[in-house]
Amino acid sequence: MVTTYLLFIVAYLLGSIPFALVVGKIGYGIDIREHGSGNLGGTNTFRTLGKKAGFIVTIADILKGTLATSLPMVFGLDIHPLWFGLAAVLGHVYPIFAKFRGGKAVATSAGVLLCYSPVVFAILAVVFFTLLFTTRYVSLSSMVTAVVAVIASIVSGDKIFIIAMCLLAGMVIYKHRANIGRIINKTEPKANFSKKQK
């Protein structure tokens, strides 16, 4: 039992590592919270620091979810791995290492799925990038993909999977509530795939 509680804490702390903040400060001398949307996630990193930093942060944020979700399997615990994944996403959104001001749950949630169900992860990746290249809205693509994740979990019939996806989708949509208003008002920034970045 003690090991279980400790691993939940480890999962949360893994999620709390603010890679966008670390990369910005160490690699560029910039506090990314003071630039762009102020969000500690991949999208703001891409827009503020460029493609290289954006890819590094996004991959690192994905791995946080993957590593946390794998903890019960690595340590032989008979506990559903998605609970640990949820702890990591909670850490990503409300990181103790960055005054509880983190990202929007997308990349770390993707990492949770990558570990738990690579097939669903692959399907959602196709959905996300199809929407992204069609609409050029990262936020809209993220929210719609989150809803599709819930549908996929319902189709699977796995009750814990359904609960976890509902919680993650709710968190993703909640963290994008300001984006929803900007999309409606047509003031939401679009991804610019042709623009040269650092």
Curated annotation (Swiss-Prot):
Catalytic activity field: an acyl phosphate + sn-glycerol 3-phosphate = a 1-acyl-sn-glycero-3-phosphate + phosphate
Keyword Transferase appears in the UniProt entry: yes
Disulfide bonds: none
An MF annotation (GO) of this entry: acyl-phosphate glycerol-3-phosphate acyltransferase activity
Pathway recorded for this protein: Lipid metabolism; phospholipid metabolism
Keywords from the named record: Cell membrane, Lipid biosynthesis, Lipid metabolism, Membrane, Phospholipid biosynthesis, Phospholipid metabolism, Transferase, Transmembrane, Transmembrane helix
A single BP term in Gene Ontology: phospholipid biosynthetic process
Protein name: Glycerol-3-phosphate acyltransferase 2
